[in-house]
């Protein structure tokens, strides 16, 4: 009887530990892959148009476009590592002042800002994503 109680206690503890681990793993995956904890409101001063495209892996990439009527030139701005397009707001205001006849596209790289994915280093995939933005323009 005593042995049975010990086995039951060990088994119950293992099940509870497994359930707790599953919950923490699910929470971590949701935050890193789907990034449900991120607030999606950006830009205090500028009111850009939000545009979305898919890259070659079908991940949705988000950009924020400051569009000027009857203009063919577009400046693509890329944020720093682990930041997002809203970190470019001051620079966008500056470029608007010196290049008033230019559209400005501030992009959220893969895994940053409102774009899908997990943050990774800057590399070949990011270059390919910028090529997709060039095609969008």
Residues covered by each model-derived region:
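A short loop-to-beta-strand scaffold at the N-terminal edge of the catalytic core in hydrolase folds
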Residues: 56-67
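Short beta-strand element of the alpha/beta-hydrolase
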Residues: 72-80
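The serine-hydrolase catalytic nucleophile loop
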Residues: 81-95
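Histidine-centered divalent metal-coordination motifs
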Residues: 62, 79, 112
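Active-site lumenal/periplasmic loops and adjacent helix-entry segments of GT-C-fold
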Residues: 86-89, 114-120
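Conserved alpha/beta-hydrolase
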Residues: 92-116
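An N-terminal hydrophobic leader/cap segment in hydrolases
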Residues: 5-54
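Alpha/beta-hydrolase active-site loop
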Residues: 120-137
